[in-house]
Structures are given as structure tokens and as C-alpha cells.
């Protein structure tokens, strides 16, 4: 599992882009920002006439005019208030030069900036100007400051001996003082020379050059650095460098130095074109100073590519590829492209063509497994060709026809494992009859599969049957109904009862000759089959196994039903679903007794959701084995959620060891015993500035805490800070069965607010998603 280290983000060079905004604080911050009154005039404002009002005016046509007392000057979006304004005109009549001189104080406003100052000069034709001893504030966004001198041009402003901050009036939490600031209006960024970063007036950082965003446009330059310390990395520092190549291309390069490991290079390239979008990323460490690989001087790296595109109207291309240099890469390095707890890296590519009645695709799929003790990983499917066709409303609307067909080749990194081609065709006919009371669906299907298998090339590879043909018919009848009634003991409520009955028949075929007899949690059965995790909804699935290599026999009846309660407004407030499979004969895939259903019925499965009120929610699921009179699985959550970002959740999870081993594999249960956990999650905004998240999970079987987390974040209009302390169960290489290992970490982040497109997030959602057991909201019936 990835170690979480102490992290101090130095919010000095730029601002982070937030994904989730805190509406209340954001609105309050905007209330402190000046807004432009009136309609914005577009076009060439310089060509518009100038209107002047004043208490007194002395006009000497055509050369000059002097206005005294409550002078009000307007030109398009520009508005100037002053006590004394002198307007002079020179040049010829065709190209006049009009200048305005303001003395003894002024108040200037337009749709981009407001300014107060002592003296000013304005070119009324070009909009150039020069202001002294001025204060300025952006319109419609955060940003203000002072300057000894401001020179105005059409597209930029030059400020001498100036300051800048995104804090509102009355808040001087941080500011940047610079000998010169240039603000580019259209490009929406500011350059600063000899910049001193101050916190409450105290200088804490100096840089000869600095860039800050003052708008929504992305800018090339240095992004926010991060630094910290950890037991494995030592002291480390990472400096992202952003390159805005084009509006639809950008690159972030992040060199990272670790005192115990050396230099690591990280890069991420994003693209958006007319035929698709995607992201390509890489991480590379040339020489490992500290790790289990240090002795052989192994180079460690990661490659990631995600792509989605549509082209030529009917074509789709999807790629999701992650590869790392070794199995323990994500244990040693913190990466946003994967986690060791995932167990594997996905490597998938697919190109498909779609038409209304059919589609086909060509794909390749494989996994890179992280488990150290697994020496035989899952098969790769390269290539795989799928074709699907459907034709509805046959026989005057009584029949629907579907066809799924596939050709795929399987091979494995282990030479002990056989390789194979699988050819599969799956036609089906169904007749669906429905009305307001329910529906009846009768379906017949045929699974026709051919395998051409080849023995592995390893010395002890097992023999396999070269050719296997398997044909399995299937018949299914599915009946659903909806019955409704008013409830006498609950006035203004309506109850529905939705019985669901399904009969499924498939004859038995011995499939032990498909694939290898070897089996582990990653191999499954055959080439791509594994038991499907059981719940209420799985009771009505056609097959117990995923993939096509194990299609179990079936002669079973599934009985289930759902009841729902609706209030007078038609809103669903409560539901309860329960069901069970009754096996008329054992479901089998081969002659191995371990692979057949050992009892005459499945476990009872229940699912329920209850919207107690608009603030309280409850959800529960339960599976009970009637043959052992024991609980297989139980989950329940009770949540109080009065408003966005405020919640308290109490939850309980239980799964017995047999259920875990059967559905998730023995590798998912490191301690080889029942899992029984109780948890408490709290997330709360205190006023509009403070947010607190707490999370505690206790394993009742181990009698140990599984995860503990406390996070506190302070938010203001111009800065935010958060502290998170966490302790959770983790693992390490060569861990013994009964050994419990904890990972302790503390993280601190600082962030500037009000710059660029930076929103004002509370931090609650981000803190809730952190951790080994992230928060999952109790199901809402909204």
C-alpha cells in the first residue's frame, strides 16, 4: 500500500484549481467584490463621445475646458469622478488629441478595474493614462492593491512600487510587494519583478520574478511546489512546471528530488482534438538508492495512457493502459495513476464500429498483477473480436432476436499455462408481453463455443484437449408484476408490491477440459471465468460465473419481490427487496464436488433503503444462509445529512470468511477470518470558514482500529489551510499472517484563493474521499 507522507504545499508561486466549490463562501466572497453597474458597451469604446457634467465649467473652444466641483466624466464603460478636470485638445481637426488632467483626487471605474488616486492624466482617444498614489481593485473577481504610479494601456497596465492581493478589504492575510507589476488584461495574468511575499505584513519569501493568474486562462510557468519528509523517501521537494502549449494541449513536468532515492522525473501531457481526448503520463527514477531493488540498481518507472475518441460518425476508440516497472512500485511511490490496493494495473484498448442494429469491436486486454506471492497471473485476451446484432419486433412484434459472437485468443506469461483460441456464438429469441400490471418475458438462448487449445511450452506443462466443442441451450421465463394499494395505517402513503419470479434451465456440460486445472484468485476458471459476487440483484442473473469458460447447469426457480412506499407527492420513501434461488437440481460446471451448489437453495438476500426524512437516510443489505443458520454478509448505514457537506454516518460491515474466500478470493482476506467492522464518519462545516472531517473504523474481530482520521480545514476568501492526521492498517513485504502493521501520517496544505478559476471549496469532500475506507453516501431515494 502507498505510504502517505507529511506534505507541506507552499502556496507562493501560483494557485491550485479546485474541483468542488463551496457555494456559500464563494457567494460571500463575491459580495465583497465590486460589480460593474449598467450594460457593458462593446465595440470600439474609444470612438464613443465623452460626456462631462460639473458644478462649474470654463470652456475655451477649441483648445481646452476646465471643470470644477463634482465633475462626472463618462465615455462608454469608463466613468470618472473628480473635483477638478481639465480637458485639452490639440492637433488638427481630422486627428485631434484629447487629454484629461485630473488633480486633487479621483475615482475611476470601468468594467474591468476600479481605481482611487491623487492625480491622473488620461488620453481620451487611446485610453492610455498615468495615475499616481493609486489604489486599484478588479471588477467581478478578487484582486486589489496599491501603486505609486500606474500607467494604463489598452491591453495592459504597468504599476511601479505596487502591491497585489486577492484578499478582500479588511483582510491582509497575504500580499505580494513588487518593484513593478504588469497586468495583461486580455491574456489574464500578471508579471511581477523583485516580488516579496508577505504574510500579515511580514516578508517570508523573495523571488526576482513571479507570475500570477488574474483570470480564467491557463498560463505557462511554475505551479505550486510541494515538499515533505518520509521514512522511505527522506526529505523531498517537487516543483511542477506547466506549459500551455495550445488551447487544446498542455504539459506538466514535475522534477522531484528525494534525499534517500534520488531524482524522479514526472510528466503529464493532456490533449483535446476533434476526434478525441486523452492523457499520457510517465514517471521515471533512474537509480534507486533505497528499496528492496537497490542492490541491482533497478530503474523504476510508470507509463499511463487514457484515450477516448469518436471519429467518422460511427467509430469509437478507447484506451486505458497503465504499466509499472515492478510489483511494488505503488507501495514505494505515491502516484495518482494507481494504488497498490487495486491489486493490478489495467491494460485495455478497444476500437468499435456502431450501427443501429449491429456493432463490432476489436480489443486487447491484459492485467499486471501486484501480488508478490502469485507466480501465475491472469490470461491476456489479445486479440478479441466481438460482433453484436439485434432485430426487434419480429413476427408482428412478438419476437426479438439478439446475437452475440466472439473470437478471442488467450495466452499467459507462464509457460506452464496452455494457450487457446475461443470462438463463441450466442443467439437468443425472446418474447416480451407487458401491461400496466406487469410483464412476462420468455427467452431461449444457445451458447455455442469452440476451443482450439495448445499445451504450454514449459517443462512440466499439463496436457490439454486440443479441440473442445460445447453447446448449451438455455430457457428462461421471467415474470414481474406491480400491485399497488393505499395504506390505512399510514395515511397519505401508497404501497406497491412487485413480485418477481424467474425459472431458468440449462443442461449440464462437463467443462473441466477447458483451460488448465490450476486455479488461483487471479486465474479463476478456464481463461476468463470467476464466480460473480452475490447480492439480491445477482439472484436474477443468467449465470453464476463471469466470462464464457464456465457456464453452470441450471434448473432453478428464483422467488423475489420488492415493496415500495410512496408519499402523497409520489416520492419513494422506503423499499425492501428480498429473494432466494431454489435449486431443483445441483448447479455444476464439472465433476468436482467443490464446484457445485452444495444445498437446495441459495442464501436469502435482502436490500433496503429508507428515506426517513429529508435529513435522515438508512440503507441495509443482508444475506442469510438457511442451511447453516448463519449470516454470510451484512451492511448497514445510518446517515444524518441536513445540508450539503454536513453529515454524520454510522455504519456496520460484516462478511464471514467463507463468503470472502468464495466471492473475492483468499488473497482478499489477509487474516483468514471473518471481517466485522463498525465505523463512524463525520463531516461538518463550522460557520463558513471551518470544516472538520473525522473517520474511525474498528474491526471487532481483530479488536483493533482499522482506520483513524481527523482532518481540519480553514477557508477564507483568499487562503485556505488544512491539517490531516491518519492512522490505518497497511501491509509490507514478507508480512506474517497475524501481523498488524499501521501507517501513521500527517499532512499539511496551504493554498491561495481567489486567483484564476480558483473556487472556494470547503475541503470536506476531498477529505472524505481519502483513506483506505472512503466515505460512501447512504443511498438516497431522491
From Swiss-Prot:
What GO cellular component is one of the record's annotations?
cell outer membrane
Cellular location(s): Cell outer membrane
| Official protein name in the record | LPS-assembly protein LptD
Gene coding for it: lptD
| Subunit annotation | Component of the lipopolysaccharide transport and assembly complex. Interacts with LptE and LptA.
Q: Which family does it belong to?
A: Belongs to the LptD family.
Which InterPro entries does UniProt cross-reference here?
A: LipoPS_assembly_LptD (IPR020889), LptD (IPR050218), LptD_C (IPR007543), OstA-like_N (IPR005653)
List, alphabetically, the NCBIfam families matched. Answer: PRK03761.1
**Keyword set, alphabetical order:** Cell outer membrane, Membrane, Signal
Record's signal peptide: 1-23
Major location (coarse): membrane
Physiological role: Together with LptE, is involved in the assembly of lipopolysaccharide (LPS) at the surface of the outer membrane.
Annotated source species: Haemophilus influenzae (strain ATCC 51907 / DSM 11121 / KW20 / Rd)
Q: Which Pfam families match?
A: LptD, LptD_N
Choose any GO biological process term that the UniProt entry carries and state it.
Gram-negative-bacterium-type cell outer membrane assembly
